[in-house]
Amino acid sequence: PKISLGPELSVGVPALAEPFEAWLTGYDEDIPHRWNLFLPEGFSITGSTVVDGLPGTEEAKSLGKWCRASSCILALRGGESGPALQECLDELKTEGTVLSFGKGPDLPSGFFRLVMEDPAQRGPGVLVKALAAREVITGWPDVFILREAVGSLFLPEDGGEPRVLPLAEPLRVPDGEDERA
């Protein structure tokens, strides 16, 4: 099969739930389960979507074009972030580099969740450059960034915070069946 991965990441940036695309000559619902049996520990296929379109049509657009947004966790290494990071994120939101950011009840103190559009153009490197330009950090060693999701952008009608939705439906694992058993 032809396989391609989602928007690239800078070296050293860990990621969760990264999309990949596989062009197959045939597909059945058991393929993701069978592939999981052979993937290295720490890797698993958690969802799948069949895109059935002729080359060159909107349905068959490249994976990069499906990936409209990313969500990442950001924190400064070595302690609390202080007001400088929050001020910088406010500026990045005002200028449109960051769609939203917040501390979130599920995050430790000093950590922020950010949603950004167009992950192929606005990745972790953009954040590091902006933070360094504003002298919040000196460079990569001063910051922790985890890309937690890449997918479609969901903008709530009620004006709530934007979210990143996965591109694939979760796999269905029959009750009592372990994926790697």
Predicted regions and their residues:
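Short, charge-patterned binding micro-sites
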Residues: P1-T25
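Core RNA-modification/binding signature centered on pseudouridine synthases
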Residues: K2-S4, A84-A181
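Intrinsically disordered, low-complexity boundary segments flanking structured domains
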Residues: G6-V11, I31-R34, E58-L63
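Short, flexible turn/loop "capping" segments at secondary-structure junctions
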Residues: G12-L16, K65-C67, L107-P108
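Unchanged
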Residues: A15, T25-E41
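A generic structural signal for beta-strand entry/edge sites
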Residues: P19, S71, S109-R113
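Internal, conserved structured core segments that host functional sites
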Residues: F20, L37-D90
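Short beta-strand-to-loop capping motifs
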Residues: A22-D28, L74-G79, L114-A120
